[in-house]
Amino acid sequence: MAGLPNSSNALQQWHHLFEAQGGQRTAEATQHLQQLLRLGLPTRKHEDWKYTPLDALLNGHFVADEGASLSAEQRDALALPLDAWRLVFIDGRYHPELSDDLAASGVEVSVDNQRQHLPDALHPEVFLHLTESLAQTVTRLRVPRNRRLDKPLLLMHITRGLAGDALNTAHCRHHLALESGAEATVVEHYLSFNEQPHFTGGRLTMTVADNAHLQHIKLAFENALSYHFAHNDLLLGRDASAFSSSFLLGGQVLRHHTSTRLGGENSNLRLNSLAMPVKNEVCDSRTWLDHQVGYCNSRQLHKTIVSDKGRAVFNGLINVAPHALKTDGQMTNNNLLLGRLAEVDTKPQLEIYADDVKCSHGATVGRIDEEQLFYLRSRGIEQQAAQQMILYAFAAELTEAIRSDALREQVLARIGQRLPGGTV
């Protein structure tokens, strides 16, 4: 793929950041860097990047600021009010002094640079290779066989923007393994320490073994000048289930991938997302799902609410492999445009190579229903309040699936900030 005219400068800077790691570089990270350099960076001419602007990002002066820390009071001021086992990462680096001791949790945790046994990427792309090459450590979380966690695991990622034109660059690499019969809830929380620009790269792989059950929630709550590029992989075994919800609620350019492989019969997947770009923000959500074996079930629901001059992008693919009989897969993308200049680009896709399957996809793009608005106004509800009621109801199908009341309230508060009349 051809690179942008200015991409060589960005690639050179990222190569320099990689070289600066010195002896910490691994063979696996080197391979990812080589893949990145071979691919180059995409242009608008490339179909997958047609609607995702990279020019401003690639003109940045990338640095990896080291040595930053926060006080416990600063951490708590940013933290979710959630009773959870918490691991804290600042600018991509693990800080044990700000994290909980997980000895009593039943979760085995290791933070090192050993990458030999990490799963291969399901659907690699350029920024996946970037994060794999620049993340300095790997955080491994293992939930043993038949263990059921009593509290969620919370991965708290705090990134600082820097004064001047330097773009602080933070990359996180995590791997979660649920062994057979295990159950866990994992929350990824991404936030900004201040209002300065920064660049976050995230990579989380999750293996859900036979008869294991995972609930995963991602909260992308970074500031309006941030860049966020992340790629999560899910691999499910026989009789396993996973329910993943991503709330993409902040960032100048935010692009999130979820790639999934259903590799064991009778596995079940629910994959949801909510994106709410405002002002000039761009939010790009992508899913890739491989029904590799038969007798599996998947349900996807992806919604966007686009305000002002914002742009939302959705691209989803369900692939049904040969012999994956009795596959049942559905994917829905619903979009609401609140501004005359708001835009959405949606592309749900099916690739079916097996017989006797039940698969469907669909997308809708519209505006607030005037009849609903008239009904609420006729009952004395003001225009803005009536709009907000309709929009909260539109998002409710996603927010009501959050089991934790405290977490749901935080998501609803963030949604409220991004609605017309909110504080964003």
Q: Regions from the language model: what does each represent?
A:
Residues 1-203, 210-213:
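Short, low-to-moderate order helix/coil transition modules at the start of elongated helical scaffolds
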Residues 117-381, 395-424:
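Conserved beta-strand/loop scaffold segments within soluble protein domains that form the structured core
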